[in-house]
From Swiss-Prot:
Subcellular location: Endoplasmic reticulum membrane; Microsome membrane
Any Gene Ontology CC annotation: endoplasmic reticulum membrane
Chief location: endoplasmic reticulum
Molecular function GO labels: heme binding; iron ion binding; monooxygenase activity; oxidoreductase activity, acting on paired donors, with incorporation or reduction of molecular oxygen
Keyword Heme tagged: yes
UniProt cross-references to Gene3D superfamilies, sorted A to Z: Cytochrome P450
Keyword Flavoprotein: no
Name recorded for this polypeptide: Probable cytochrome P450 4ac1
Residues engaged in binding heme: E317, C454
Organism whose genome encodes this protein: Drosophila melanogaster (Fruit fly)
Amino acid sequence: MWIALLGIPILLAVLTLLLKHINKTYFILSLTKRVRTEDGSPLESKVAIMPGKTRFGNNLDILNFTPASVFNFVRESTAKAKGQNYLWYFLYAPMYNVVRPEEAEEVFQSTKLITKNVVYELIRPFLGDGLLISTDHKWHSRRKALTPAFHFNVLQSFLGIFKEECKKFLNVLEKNLDAELELNQVIPPFTLNNICETALGVKLDDMSEGNEYRKAIHAIEEVLIQRVCNPLMYYNWYFFVYGDYRKHLQNLRIVHDFSSRIIERKRQQFQQKQLGEVDEFGRKQRYAMLDTLLAAEADGQIDHQGICDEVNTFMFEGYDTTSTCLIFTLLMLALHEDVQKKCYEEVENLPEDSDDISMFQFNKLVYLECVIKESLRMFPSVPFIGRQCVEETVVNGMVMPKDTQISIHIYDIMRDPRHFPKPDLFQPDRFLPENTVNRHPFAYVPFSAGQRNCIGQKFAILEMKVLLAAVIRNFKLLPATQLEDLTFENGIVLRTQENIKVKLSKRVK
């Protein structure tokens, strides 16, 4: 009997040693394999490991968070890491958070790390297999097919539409002189109209239809955050029972019906004209995005669902992200009178009649472009992007288990004081050519980087230049909102809880 009793402590000791050994390789309470260094050195020498609120890793750290508290939690985690990249351990998978451009470079440049992470799976019902989410052959073939739709000559053909929409926008501003103008209300219709008429080739005349689309987009984003902040919500069955599933379906139906009507309208126009035509010099004409997709459909390279996915992706990315940047840029111009004055002096050199301003002249607005870039640095429209290890992969000298989630924190990378001294100050001069010479090539990545960078970034910059030049030339911007009054929120794009407001006064010429 006493021999049996003596054996119990020995058995417990053996089990303890066994568990310790297993725990070096596996985070048992998170049911996931641990990250380890390739050379066997301590993991803490390469990455900070964020302690969780419980013994179950970081699984319960963001439970029932709001978009605002998610934003603050990520900023606090970055501050605790003290300039290091850091690890979270969630159920079934670690998450590697990259906040330094040096390590982000390897992720961006990797040919293995092109699969988006699990958060994007929650967006799939909205965007399908569009460029943002698709991978492998589908992504490569679609990217190759769509690249010509953003060629210089195509962008040049959009200039007239941008100018026309700007005139309508200026008329809206004229009606709001000396009043507080809510930028969140007036900017999105402008960018949505531009997307529909340029890239999609359909004029959006029914503004109420556009308003319904924008409201549905915001509702979809709220559901996304609800699911991100509750690990159980990642499971569709749980979301169906306890989440806003039916409301989500209704909003998906609104946005998909909206894009489908646009596609059908364009398909009818497309069938009435001869594609493959040549211009007066005998060169094959280039077409905007939806024309390109319809031509590919006619050649059997893409089906109707594929067109819907790409249109939904580009409408969302092109309208919402550009709106966000324009809103923050106008706010920063209102808050910094000296910067606004320099921009005004630059745009004053443009021809009197906006119809006479060429693409070349817009490209010469160097300081205005610096202002746009600095706004994007401080307030990136997309504050983070995600990747996933589809197999065990070595990243930055660490062995990442299969299914490791990688989050590249664009917001924090572009506020790294080593590359942007006094990062919380608005200083457009950072982007003057002479000040960018020695900067790390991946320190400024508002449009992502590497092979999965944003296909429409030149489109966005031109669109913003045209609008900002027109506004600055005709109106003086005065602040009605202060930065310290804003509560930032993490979503698919960066948002604030409060509407951002400015005041306008007419410039006397």
